[in-house]
Amino acid sequence: AFLSVNKKARVFAQRAAFGPLYGLDEGQPPRFVGLDIALASHPQVRLLDGEYAIDEHLYLFPWVSAEGAATPSNRSLMEEMDGEMVRDRLMHEQSLIIREGDKRFLVAGCAHNGIAAILDRFREIEGRSPDAVLSGFHLSGPGTSAAPPDEALSALAARLSAHHATYYTGHCTGQSAYERLSELLPGRMGHLSAGLSFSL
């Protein structure tokens, strides 16, 4: 739909985004959740195989390998490999670094590999922490707003506090997890919602 109304915008996607990706719903067969393969050859789509500098201000980096950092909510995400359903390796995910003057910002999606691991990769690339992060944290699974155990949220808050950033999050973070993280990181959490406008 987007490409049918915008004839100029470039779309950058990791090549793996066009793979056979599926979601699991309890008691149901795997449901295809990937992209239409026909879009891969669209003239406005640029397929990437790793990190990519769009220009001096915008830099994309793909998924990060973070053993143990991915959230339990990922268990419903699958991909097809050699005719078998396996856990999604999340190689289709990417994050965006925005460089504006002396400010640095991180924009991620649902951070399925763990926002803390993505922040660590940001620091490796930039040599510093971001000033602000806009991302889902993928702490609540499909169809539930239940938060992870408090010890898991406390451990995440400790990782986040080491980066001295302000965090704007919503969607897959879940309301109860957001409220608890706001208590653990006072003054450093902001809620993202559709139509929100703010200055960084």
What do these predicted ranges mean?
Residues 54-60, 143, 178-179, 199-200:
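Short, solvent-exposed polar/charged micro-motifs at secondary-structure junctions
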Residues 21, 55, 62, 68-71, ...:
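Short acidic/glycine-rich loop or secondary-structure boundary segments that cap or lie
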Residues 51, 193-198:
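Glycine-centered loop/turn motifs
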Residues 1, 10, 86-95, 99-194:
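Cap/insert and terminal regions of metallo-dependent hydrolase folds
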Residues 17-21, 140-141, 196-199:
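Short gly/pro/ser/thr-enriched loop/turn and capping motifs at secondary-structure boundaries
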Residues 26-28, 50-102:
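Active-site-proximal loop/helix segment associated with metal-binding centers of metalloenzymes
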Residues 42-46, 57, 184-190:
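Active-site regions of enzymes building and remodeling cell-envelope glycoconjugates
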Residues 1-46, 50, 64-73, 158-166:
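Active-site HxH/HxHxD metal-binding segment of metal-dependent hydrolases
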